[in-house]
């Protein structure tokens, strides 16, 4: 019986010539045309046992592919060009791809030009980017490859600070490619992370490129009232879907987002004041009742800073309160601050440089009802008076933007809405052009370059140019609207001395 001799790494294997003749694959057709009898055909880059498996497939149309042998069989099938076996191997590898092997699969697919495996491994890296940074192979990704991965619209990062930590870890292994840092968008980063990068001697150039990472864009949470039940919905920029998170039957409450959880504070249920605070995780949709506030109150002013929820003032039955307290996320104890100088409800509170500013609202007792224009600032553990607002306002909505405060007033006793800017360093109020007039609730959010206002429609106000853009949007029955990013960066005053500790904490929090 005639046979063809193959030599693989010094080992000889004889193959019946009839198998070669019957083969439909180009590799074996070429052997039929050019093979010289008795001359061994040397096969390089192929495993002996993998070649045996391919011969079995040619004989019986069956092949035993496992996790342990799939790579060597695939290499042999690619070199010898047996498409059915290539497809079987690729399917096996894709089925078993995970965050611990996806970079190796990615490199393997590039080496042998396997597009399906390349796409699947790239998708796995994109979906598990924070986990794959622990892979020793992560630092071997090229600058262009990492740029492609981090520029993908669906890369699984939920804040630009996370992108920064991924880049810093890669730069540690690739110090000659520090300019990759320019793919960051500083306007989506915290000041703390920007300072840390600056202390490392890195400079982020101002980018005019569009933001491609959907996950770092603003999430939206909306509470809408319908038939006495309010429905909570959450919009994820990464998935581009709205999901129903849950319902609440409260009225006259306030709400805030902190660490991807929505806190619903105080208010009334069935016309009765409550002092409980409920929290729903916007990702898992799980509810938790946290420790009660110090008293029953509604129409409180709330703000968040450094992982803490602050509740200030409010209405205790018919009397305004000056109580100020905060709850740190993940803890169960409310911490009291000194009381406000002037008790109030329905005012606004906002943080600027770790100081709390409270403005406007109503001071009321059983005998008095006073609409306020005064402003208080909590700094160095005490409340101090600041320059009053230009007018008295019972309803105020305020937001910090670029180190100053922008305040929009509601309409009750007033005849129209007002827009003010409070210049913090000068303790000075100035009045700005107000584009619209709206009777009813409003919601104000800081969104990078602009301030978003939800009123009778959607408005974008650009402070630097003092311009407005109007968008048609149904706002009926909206009880709460907020845009937020998932900021969980440890907050501290980063210095050269504290920088290693800060980066270590960020790596543990973001990348493990």
Swiss-Prot record:
Q: Which residues form the signal peptide?
A: none
Which domain of life does the protein's organism represent? Viruses
Keyword entries, A-Z: Kelch repeat, Repeat
Asked whether the UniProt record includes Repeat among its keywords, one would answer yes
Q: Entry's Gene3D superfamilies? A: 1.25.40.420, Kelch-type beta propeller (2.120.10.80), Potassium Channel Kv1.1, Chain A (3.30.710.10)
Taking every annotated instance into account, which residue ranges of this chain make up the domain BACK?
A: 102-176
Q: Which positions does the entry assign to Kelch repeats? A: 216-261, 262-307, 309-354, 356-403, 405-449, 452-498
Q: Which InterPro entries match?
A: BACK (IPR011705), BTB/POZ_dom (IPR000210), Kelch-typ_b-propeller (IPR015915), Kelch_1 (IPR006652), SKP1/BTB/POZ_sf (IPR011333)
Q: Which one Pfam family would you cite for this protein? A: BACK
SMART domains named in the record: BACK, BTB, Kelch
Q: Where is the BTB domain?
A: 2-67
Q: Which PANTHER family match?
A: KELCH PROTEIN, KELCH-LIKE PROTEIN 8
Recorded family membership: Belongs to the poxviruses Kelch family.
Q: What is this protein called?
A: Kelch repeat protein C2
This chain's source organism reads Camelpox virus (strain CMS)
């Amino acid at each position: 019986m005639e046979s063809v001799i193959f030599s693989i790494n010094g080992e000889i294997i004889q193959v019946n010539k009839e198998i070669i003749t019957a083969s439909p694959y180009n590799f074996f057709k070429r052997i039929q045309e050019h093979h010289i009898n008795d001359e061994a055909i040397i096969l390089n880059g192929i495993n002996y046992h993998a070649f045996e498996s391919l011969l079995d497939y040619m004989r019986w149309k069956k092949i035993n592919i496992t996790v342990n042998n799939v790579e060597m069989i695939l290499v042999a099938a690619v070199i010898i060009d047996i498409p059915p076996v290539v497809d079987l191997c690729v399917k096996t590898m894709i089925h078993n791809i995970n965050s611990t092997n996806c970079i190796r699969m990615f490199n393997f697919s590039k080496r042998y030009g396997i597009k399906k495996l390349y796409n699947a491994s790239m998708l796995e890296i994109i979906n598990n980017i924070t986990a794959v940074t622990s892979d020793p192979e992560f630092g071997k990704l090229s600058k262009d490859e990492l740029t492609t991965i981090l520029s993908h619209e669906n890369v699984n990062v939920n804040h630009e600070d996370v992108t920064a930590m991924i880049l810093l870890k890669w730069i540690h292994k690739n110090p000659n490619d520090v300019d990759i840092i320019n793919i960051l968008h500083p306007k989506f980063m915290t000041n703390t992370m920007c300072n840390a990068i600056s202390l490392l001697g890195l400079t982020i150039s101002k980018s005019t490129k569009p933001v491609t990472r959907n996950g770092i864009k603003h999430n939206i949470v909306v509470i809408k009232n319908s038939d006495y039940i309010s429905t909570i919905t959450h919009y994820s920029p990464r998935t581009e879907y709205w999901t129903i998170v849950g319902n609440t039957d409260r009225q006259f409450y306030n709400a805030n987002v902190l660490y991807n959880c929505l806190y619903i504070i105080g208010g009334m249920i069935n016309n009765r004041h409550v002092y409980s605070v409920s929290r729903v995780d916007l990702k898992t949709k799980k509810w938790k009742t946290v420790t009660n506030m110090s008293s029953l109150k509604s129409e409180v002013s709330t703000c968040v800073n450094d992982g803490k929820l602050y509740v200030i003032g409010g209405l205790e039955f018919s009397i305004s309160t000056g109580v100020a307290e905060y709850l740190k996320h993940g803890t169960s104890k409310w911490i009291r601050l000194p009381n406000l100088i002037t008790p109030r409800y329905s005012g606004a509170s906002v943080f600027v440089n770790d100081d709390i500013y409270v403005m406007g609202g109503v001071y009321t007792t059983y005998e008095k009802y006073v609409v306020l224009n005064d402003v208080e600032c909590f700094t160095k553990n005490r409340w101090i008076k600041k320059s009053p607002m230009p007018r008295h306002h019972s309803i105020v909505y305020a937001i910090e933007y670029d180190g100053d405060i922008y305040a929009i007033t509601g309409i009750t006793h007033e005849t129209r809405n007002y827009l003010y800017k409070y210049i913090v360093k000068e303790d000075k109020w100035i009045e700005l052009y107000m584009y619209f007039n709206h009777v009813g609730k409003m919601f104000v959010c800081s969104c990078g370059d602009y301030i978003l206002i939800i009123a009778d429609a959607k408005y974008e106000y650009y402070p630097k140019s003092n311009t407005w853009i109007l968008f048609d949007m149904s706002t009926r029955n909206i009880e709460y609207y907020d845009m937020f990013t998932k900021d969980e960066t440890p907050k501290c005053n980063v210095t050269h001395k504290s920088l290693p500790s800060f980066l270590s904490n960020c790596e543990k929090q973001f990348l493990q």
